[in-house]
């Protein structure tokens, strides 16, 4: 044992181990492991018991107890009865003689081992465990502490229902509880009371452990053993006494809470709650809430549940509601205390939500309670002032706090909404009080203003648009109050952002009440909005102004000059800022460019006179175009790097031009106000010079593509002559992402201009096909990258847009382009790609697109007479390859899922393809397809029925029949046909 003892000390965190080398410690660990694993069970037990009796070292005692515990847990079936009896008597002797001064980790391990023996042996092998362990009266600290730890370990490892248990554990737990209830629970309860009385002053820590053990057992013992005239007053006295140390007071509160939460019939629960209420004068007072937060919350939850079950018409139900309302002041005090250690805010919030949900038409008393609940919501939604600076600059700490608060507020907002629905008037009065307080004090905090505005914003989510528009309730008073508000802390980012959002939430009120439009514009244009010192606030204000202009439109025409004058410096700053050196990161939807969209929308309002539009647009476009020309000239002389200030400056200007154009449409620009069209056409020419000069600067090219999208939309057919030169430049040095953007533009042009784009498409198609044959080669997918890489995602997106490109060609009278001499060279590869994809691509949506493309090509290229076909051989290809591979074999494959929505849509397109092939190809298609059906083991009668259904006009019946035919063939083949 001496060698083992030395090894244990070296392997532990003892002083001897600290002085040992790593090699020596490793050797000691290995020695201990061999002793534990290779010693026979009986010998190991005797060795450990000897160590417990003879060694003076706590680390050795712990190793021995842990080793016995593990061996017993793993080999208990092999343990001899005599060994177990020896172990039992030794451990009970240690427990009974336990000294409270011994290390807690050692007492916990001894308790855990005794709890395991209880599980295995009580009561059938040894029925006296608890009778032996219950300390005699008067209880001493050592044995009392040890007994409590045994009960706690037993609860943790077996009895508690807070943890998942397997069937064997559940059976053992039931057996132990039943035996304890029959044998010793009353004696144990008396011991808890005696320990609390005698040790609360002498050794409060041990008294607290004893009461914690009691709390754990209350859920399954006879509650009257604790809920009586002797024990309950004692617990209240301990909980509320100024002389009670915090752990002891908390343990007493825990016991009372467990009593309140005890499961029982609702009427019995009402009687129990009544007894608790009567046992302590002032139980529902705010002071009780501060000192017994867990208890008053549990009490309120149980009273509410009784009220729900019994109803207000029942005497006990009414009594439950009365007791609930009596304890509410204590609940509110607990909730408002902000003490996270004492108050479970989740439980309080759940109770308050349940309480509000019981209200239909609140009484005056209940309205008062709702006001207090709103105050709880306000307090719990408020930020901690310690994070004020972090939230203003939004550093890492501030971002984490903002995210945490957003999550924390979800349930609070749900509760706020419930109150709004039950008592809208009271809610509006509450918010009015918050706003008045915030506006009347120069010392009001950032946190108080932010939460007041947030609640007003959330109110706007709940009330209907009609109520906002008409200013129902107090909205007619609150919105003007808000419009004129200038809070002392308005410079703070949080306050400024929520202020602007709240103004925007109620903008329908300004739409109906024109007199407030100037106030609204002032908010957006002064230092509260676009001219705020914080760049994030300024950009957000620009975005919200753009939305306001979209809504108010003609109402803003009288203020056009005022708005443009106020925005002049912001417009200049956007294109002049050195964004390359800015650390600020903006979301793509709020990067500051929205002020250009706002101005474009404003100028583009039809109520603005033509001359005024020309004047304003000239003042906007000319300086931007001049900036572009100057930057291009400098860049040609000195070069243009992708991340250089010049390149980024050009990007910003082109973004600004794109955003301005969003305020205009083709009808206005090319119809009623053609002068505007000329101006945008000149701007396009300037932008194209950038593309011609620097086609390889990818970020710049991406911004130019976005601008081209807008020009296609507003200039209409007149833009076509400018497009070829742009497209040729956009095909320079392309990768997957670049080609994807390019195809998106081409697809827009095809959909917009249809057959008018014939010549353009004929010109660029060979280059497109050539580029894509390389980028979308088989090697790119099979040998390139893992399927989850960014490169692979870009390839997949390009593939999707290419199939859409072919479909747009086929559906917009442009399929003859594919038959021209310059494009025909690529036709065979395209047909094979469409065939393979339609039959077997893993993306069902791609297969559907390809089938639709084939259907449209059949309609375009084939007639009922083969002589008139535009592409010789296409008919045979469709009958022999497509019809067989896609319409039959691909759906016979067991991977084709008839329960999947996208697959069902594909199946519908396949059925349509068969109808079109029959319409254009006639008997040639039918004969070949029926032959293939028979080769696939289709019964002859079903093949004949197929022909009949194909000839009919009911496509739904045809589809249903063909699905059943496919399933029957699958069954006959037993899934043997797998098409790839």
Swiss-Prot record:
GO cellular component: cytoplasm; nuclear matrix; nuclear pore
Keyword flag Transport: yes
Subcellular location: Nucleus; Cytoplasm
Annotated keywords: Cytoplasm, Nucleus, Receptor, RNA-binding, Transport, tRNA processing, tRNA-binding
Superkingdom of origin: Eukaryota
Tissue: Expressed in roots, stems, leaves, flowers and embryos.
Presence of keyword Protein biosynthesis: no
Any one GO molecular function term: small GTPase binding
Pfam families per UniProt: Exportin-T, Xpo1
Disruption phenotype: Reduced size in non-mature plants, delayed panicle heading, reduced seed number and low seed fertility.
A biological process term (GO) from this entry: meristem initiation
Family, per entry: Belongs to the exportin family.
Known function: Probable tRNA nucleus export receptor which regulates tRNA processing and facilitates tRNA translocation across the nuclear pore complex. Is required for correct leaf initiation at different developmental stages and may play a role in floral patterning.
PANTHER family: EXPORTIN-T (PTHR15952:SF11), EXPORTIN-T/LOS1 (PTHR15952)
Protein name per the record: Exportin-T
Organism: Oryza sativa subsp. japonica
Taxonomic placement: Eukaryota, Viridiplantae, Streptophyta, Embryophyta, Tracheophyta
């Amino acid at each position: 044992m001496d060698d083992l003892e030395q090894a244990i000390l070296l392997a532990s965190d003892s002083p001897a181990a600290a002085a040992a080398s790593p090699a020596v410690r490793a050797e000691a660990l290995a020695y201990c492991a061999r002793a534990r694993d290779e010693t026979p069970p009986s010998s190991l037990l005797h060795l450990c018991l000897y160590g417990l009796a003879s060694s003076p070292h706590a680390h050795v005692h712990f190793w021995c107890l842990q080793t016995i515990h593990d061996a017993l847990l793993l080999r208990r079936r092999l343990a001899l009865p005599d060994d177990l009896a020896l172990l039992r008597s030794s451990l009970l002797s240690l427990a009974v003689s336990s000294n409270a001064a011994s290390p807690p980790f050692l007492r916990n391990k001894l308790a855990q081992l005794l709890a395991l023996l209880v599980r295995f042996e009580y009561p059938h092998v040894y029925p006296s465990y608890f009778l032996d362990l219950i300390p005699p009266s008067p209880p001493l600290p050592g044995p009392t502490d040890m007994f409590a730890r045994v009960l706690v370990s037993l609860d943790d490892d077996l009895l508690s229902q807070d943890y998942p248990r397997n069937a064997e554990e559940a059976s053992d737990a039931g057996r132990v509880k039943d035996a304890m209830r029959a044998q010793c629970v009353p004696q144990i309860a008396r011991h808890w009371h005696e320990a609390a009385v005698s040790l609360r002053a002498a050794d409060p820590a041990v008294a607290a452990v004893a009461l914690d053990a009691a709390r754990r057992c209350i859920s399954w013992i006879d509650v009257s053993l604790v809920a009586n005239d002797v024990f309950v007053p004692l617990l209240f006295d301990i909980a509320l006494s100024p002389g009670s140390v915090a752990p002891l007071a908390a343990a007493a509160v825990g016991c009372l809470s467990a009593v309140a939460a005890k499961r029982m019939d609702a009427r019995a629960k009402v009687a129990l709650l009544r007894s608790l209420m009567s046992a302590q004068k002032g139980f529902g007072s705010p002071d009780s809430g501060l000192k017994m937060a867990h208890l008053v919350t549990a009490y309120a939850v149980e009273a509410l549940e009784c009220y729900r079950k019994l109803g207000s018409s029942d005497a006990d139900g009414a009594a439950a509601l009365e007791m609930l309302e009596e304890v509410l002041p204590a609940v509110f005090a607990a909730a408002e205390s902000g003490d996270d250690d004492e108050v479970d805010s989740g439980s309080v919030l759940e109770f308050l939500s349940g309480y509000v949900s019981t209200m239909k038409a609140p009484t005056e008393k209940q309205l008062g309670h709702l006001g207090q609940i709103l105050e709880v919501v306000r307090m719990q939604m408020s930020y901690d002032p310690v994070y004020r600076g972090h939230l203003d600059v939004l550093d890492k700490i501030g971002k984490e706090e903002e995210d945490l608060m957003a999550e924390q507020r979800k349930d609070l907002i749900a509760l706020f909404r419930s109150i709004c629905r039950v008592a809208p008037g009271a809610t509006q009065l509450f918010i009015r009080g918050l706003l008045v307080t915030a506006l009347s004090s120069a010392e009001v905090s950032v946190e108080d203003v932010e939460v007041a505005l947030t609640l007003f914003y959330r109110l706007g989510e709940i009330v209907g648009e009609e109520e906002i528009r008409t200013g129902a309730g107090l909205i007619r008073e609150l919105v003007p109050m808000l419009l004129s508000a200038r809070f002392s802390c308005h410079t703070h980012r949080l306050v400024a952002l929520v202020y602007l959002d709240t103004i925007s939430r109620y903008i329908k009120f300004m739409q109906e009440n024109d007199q407030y439009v100037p106030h609204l514009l002032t908010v957006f244009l002064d230092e509260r909005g676009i001219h705020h010192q914080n760049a994030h606030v300024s950009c957000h204000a620009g975005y919200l102004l753009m939305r306001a202009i979209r809504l108010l439109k003609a109402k803003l025409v009288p203020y056009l000059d005022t708005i443009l004058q106020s925005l002049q410096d912001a417009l200049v700053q956007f294109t002049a800022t050195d964004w390359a050196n800015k650390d600020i990161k903006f979301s793509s939807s709020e990067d500051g460019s929205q002020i250009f969209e706002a101005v474009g929308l404003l100028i583009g309002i039809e109520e603005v006179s033509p001359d005024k539009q020309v004047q304003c647009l000239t003042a906007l476009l000319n300086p931007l175009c001049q900036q572009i020309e100057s930057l291009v000239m400098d860049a040609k002389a000195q070069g243009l790097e992708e991340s250089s200030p010049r390149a980024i400056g050009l990007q910003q200007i082109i973004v600004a031009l794109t955003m301005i154009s969003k305020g205009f449409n083709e009808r206005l620009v090319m119809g009623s106000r053609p002068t505007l069209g000329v101006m945008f056409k000149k701007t396009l020419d300037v932008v194209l010079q950038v593309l011609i000069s620097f086609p390889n600067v990818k970020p710049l090219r991406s911004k130019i593509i976005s601008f081209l999208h807008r020009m296609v939309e507003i200039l209409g057919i007149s833009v076509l002559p400018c497009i070829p030169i742009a497209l040729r430049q956009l095909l320079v040095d392309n990768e997957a992402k670049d080609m994807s953007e390019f195809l998106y533009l081409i697809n827009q042009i095809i959909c917009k201009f249809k057959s008018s784009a014939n010549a353009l498409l004929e010109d660029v198609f060979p280059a497109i096909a050539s580029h894509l044959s390389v980028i979308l080669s088989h090697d790119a997918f099979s040998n390139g990258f893992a399927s989850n890489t960014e490169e692979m995602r870009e390839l997949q997106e390009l593939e999707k847009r290419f199939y859409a490109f072919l479909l747009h060609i086929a559906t917009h009278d442009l399929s003859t382009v594919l038959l021209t001499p310059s494009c025909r060279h690529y036709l065979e590869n395209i047909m094979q790609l469409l065939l393979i994809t339609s039959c077997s691509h893993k993306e069902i949506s791609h297969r559907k697109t390809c089938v639709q493309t084939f259907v449209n090509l059949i309609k375009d290229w084939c007639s009922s007479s083969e002589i008139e076909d535009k592409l010789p051989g296409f008919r045979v290809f469709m009958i022999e390859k497509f019809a067989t591979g896609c319409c039959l074999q691909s759906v016979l494959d067991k991977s084709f899922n008839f329960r999947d929505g996208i697959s069902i849509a594909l199946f519908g397109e396949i059925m349509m393809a068969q109808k079109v092939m029959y319409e254009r190809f006639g008997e040639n298609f039918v004969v070949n397809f029926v032959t293939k059906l028979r080769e696939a083991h289709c019964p002859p009668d079903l093949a004949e029925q197929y022909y009949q259904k194909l000839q009919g006009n009911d496509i739904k019946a045809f589809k249903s029949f063909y699905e059943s035919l496919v399933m029957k063939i699958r069954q006959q083949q037993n899934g043997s046909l797998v098409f790839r």
